[in-house]
Amino acid sequence: MRYRTILAALILALGAGAYAAADPPASISMLNVSFDPTRELYDDYNVVFAAYWKKKTGQSVTVQQSNGGSGKQARAVIDGLAADVVTLALAYDIDAIADKAKLLPANWQSRLPYNSTPYTSTIVFLVRQGNPKHIRDWNDLVKPGISVIAPNPKTSGGARWNFLAAWAYALAQPGGNAESAKAFVTKLYKNVPVLDSGARGSTTTFVERGIGDVLVGWESDALLAVNKLGRGRFAIVRPSRSVLAEPPVALVDAVVDKRQTRTVAQAYLQYLYSPQGQDVIARNYFRPRLPSVARRYAGEFPAMKLATIAQFGGWAKAQQTYFADGGVFDQIYQPGQ
């Protein structure tokens, strides 16, 4: 109910009220620092939002994009990249910006509906047409001779979702526990020949360079590959268990106040929740939040059994346990071995 109330208020705000500034400039620019697989989404959305904003306020807005591995993008903002908004792969990366650089408040997730996640996704497998290696589930990825393409959890948000999805699968097996899950992901990463820094790099490795038997990654990138990048060359395999990936968005307060872009940057994030924004999201293969839009695209996004980040104790605990220096990933992955 709380999210519905906030969402209703946002939609009301989008439809009413004039631009707050007395004499806004005729044109304005802003920077969206995002994670790897959202390139097409925001290329599309930025055009739609600019048209909406021009009609509403008379002001022209240019949205510049920066895309890369979510962890690397967060570090760039911490180190001084002046993002008006960040749209990253997971909450921990925006928490890091709040904690280390103090560029936005610690309660940033409470400012927009659904904990500031206007879309979701999950982790699936992309295989070559005909599925020549007969890959059906996570257990097939640990078989000898299977080449798995996946990005690096130290730099990529999607890679961290990959890791947790595999861990959740292992835990769900008969007798599954932390020890057996660790053994399972150890075997899995032994089949990964190279770790790209970001999810899109891994997609390029698999789709364009023809390396590997299976790509583990974002559902959005898999759908993009099947429908556009390599039509007729690939197929999606949905594992028996995956993870609910919730990529969040946030206003970077210190930047928008310095650059006087708060009003347009705030509207930019709010419009993601509008029917028009949600349609752009779904067209670009992310799962929309708005039920009316989700129903129209239900065939594209079948129901799956998904673990949640809450089952790992939240992102702060998951990051410390699995991905921090000396954590589980460092313990199980040795490059070249």
Predicted features and spans:
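Short, low-complexity disordered leader/linker segments with a strong preference
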Residues: 1-29
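N-terminal segment of the mature folded domain
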Residues: 24-155, 298, 334
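Short beta-strand->loop
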Residues: 33-35, 127-129, 147-174, 189-192, ...
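Stable alpha-helical elements in mature extracytoplasmic
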Residues: 37-41, 45, 73, 82, ...
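Sec-exported extracytoplasmic/periplasmic mature domains
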Residues: 46-55, 78-82, 91, 98-102, ...
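Short helix-loop capping/hinge motifs at secondary-structure junctions, enriched
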Residues: 130-136, 155, 168-176, 255-263
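Ligand-binding pocket segment of bilobal, Venus flytrap-like solute-binding proteins
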Residues: 173-240
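Extracellular/periplasmic juxtamembrane helices and adjacent flexible linkers that interface
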Residues: 256-337
